[in-house]
Amino acid sequence: MAQQGQGSMDPAALDDIIRRLLDYRNPKPGTKQAMLNESEIRQLCIVSREIFLQQPNLLELEAPIKICGDIHGQYSDLLRLFEYGGFPPTANYLFLGDYVDRGKQSLETICLLLAYKIKYPENFFLLRGNHECASINRIYGFYDECKRRFSVRLWKVFTDSFNCLPVAAVIDDKILCMHGGLSPDLTNVEQIKNIKRPTDVPDSGLLCDLLWSDPSKDVKGWGMNDRGVSYTFGPDKVAEFLIKNDMDLICRAHQVVEDGYEFFADRQLVTIFSAPNYCGEFDNAGAMMSVDESLMCSFQILKPADRKPRFL
């Protein structure tokens, strides 16, 4: 039998990992270990990293495709998205980053996504979010979850994979997708191809902005960002970029929006956020955007759970 190299995975073993992940919907209280062992998770990281590097940093994709925003470890909501849209490979998917941190099940979330990436490399796509970065997920929960359930060593293996994620995608030359937004350093989409990987996310510059910037209706041109990182950009910058690059729409995530999706700049930009009841603190819906062959966009909504009254 052929030896499985670092860049491949036994198909039966991969299918078994996916089966266990789909079985493991709600862990019992006090369950320490996930349904996977550390060496299996490490293998998911190593093999997916190879695939990310084999594919371009600016993905060129075709419709029809379904696009999802932030998940943030809300594993049961990720499974709801697949129930709505169809489990891979019945539909093609693009995720816009922020798979880990804040939610309770970052490990299940990222493991299922990496497993699907390995199984369906030409039908399932993952972009990098600002939380797929060691300095951020060290603080906001993923490091602690890895350490508590497995080891710090495993967190470092995830970091190696995250440092190779692509940062943007273009759908049929007309829809530009990224996690955060535009950059004053970005005039031509082709520039994204020049970002070298593996790389950490720097504190400023093109890669930082693609993962961190936000649209703002109150700004003309470029403005300060309340996050303390990157910029905000006005509707004028969206229109200018689309005209210059002969595109129709910018699709991004990165911000909680009440209905799960929200248009900006005369529907030239859309924000998609896919974690309903974000952190248990918001009453937002989650959404998934379906792009059909003619590039018509429609939305599937995950309604927030009904809040239980605290006092009767």
UniProtKB/Swiss-Prot annotation:
Its EC number is 3.1.3.16. Transmembrane segments: none annotated. It catalyses: O-phospho-L-seryl-[protein] + H2O = L-seryl-[protein] + phosphate; O-phospho-L-threonyl-[protein] + H2O = L-threonyl-[protein] + phosphate. Interacts with SRK2D/SNRK2.2 and SRK2E/SNRK2.6. Its main location: nucleus. One of its GO terms (biological process) is protein dephosphorylation. The active site is at H131 (proton donor). This is Serine/threonine-protein phosphatase PP1 isozyme 2. It comes from Arabidopsis thaliana (Mouse-ear cress). Mn(2+) 2 binds at D98, N130, H179, H254. It comes from the Eukaryota. It is an enzyme of class 3 (hydrolase). Mn(2+) 1 binds at D70, H72, D98.
